Design a protein with these regions (language model features):
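Preference for long, amphipathic alpha-helical scaffolds in soluble/luminal domains
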Residues: 1-180
Length: 180
């Protein structure tokens, strides 16, 4: 996905390079800002009542299905690039991500509290894609975004995310994700 790849590459360059080419970073940031979804409430709105749109989608022309994973990467890239210049996009993206946090403190990729496991027993559900439960990888990316923005454990969303990740750690010390 150009959105994911651009956000990830931009953030990596900014993290690793103390003097990146400002023209290149500005061009990438502006391209990302143009793709922020600010006016479409997709299926995610059914479980996220009152949350304003503000995310980014993995694919082009997929305004009804933005995802928190891409959004977190883009917000981190914009924040690292120029937090003042891109403050509106950053704030709206972070607001949307916080609004998409599930009751257990984690984040799914596209939805809130989409854990109706009985749906997995429907015969046409053999591929297991009817649910979008919170996962460690997506939740960790959202937590990283919030930490980069200066939110610590005293922030309610951060505390809930830390709790979710602690509860989800495997006995062997690892975490299991779904997307990355």
């Amino acid at each position: 996905s150009p959105v994911w790849d651009t956000g990830l590459a931009m953030h990596a360059v900014l993290e690793a390079n103390s003097e990146p080419d400002k023209t290149i970073m500005e061009k990438a940031a502006n391209w990302l800002v143009e793709r922020q979804i600010l006016d479409v409430i997709g299926d995610w709105g059914a479980n996220a009542h009152g949350v304003r749109p503000g995310g980014w989608a993995f694919q082009y022309w997929n305004d009804y299905y933005p995802d928190v994973d891409d959004t977190a990467v883009v917000v981190m890239a914009l924040h690292r690039s120029d937090p003042d210049r891109y403050s509106e996009a950053i704030a709206r993206g972070a607001e949307w991500i916080i609004g998409m946090q599930s009751g257990n403190g984690g984040w799914g990729a596209f939805d809130v509290d989409n854990e109706h496991h009985f749906l997995q027993h429907i015969p046409f559900a053999d591929h297991g894609a009817l649910l979008d439960p919170p996962t460690a990888d997506v939740s960790a990316r959202c937590l990283s975004m919030m930490a980069q923005m200066g939110h610590g454990p005293d922030n309610q969303a951060v505390a809930r995310a830390i709790g979710y990740l602690k509860r989800g750690q495997e006995v062997n010390g690892s975490w299991y994700g779904s997307w990355g």
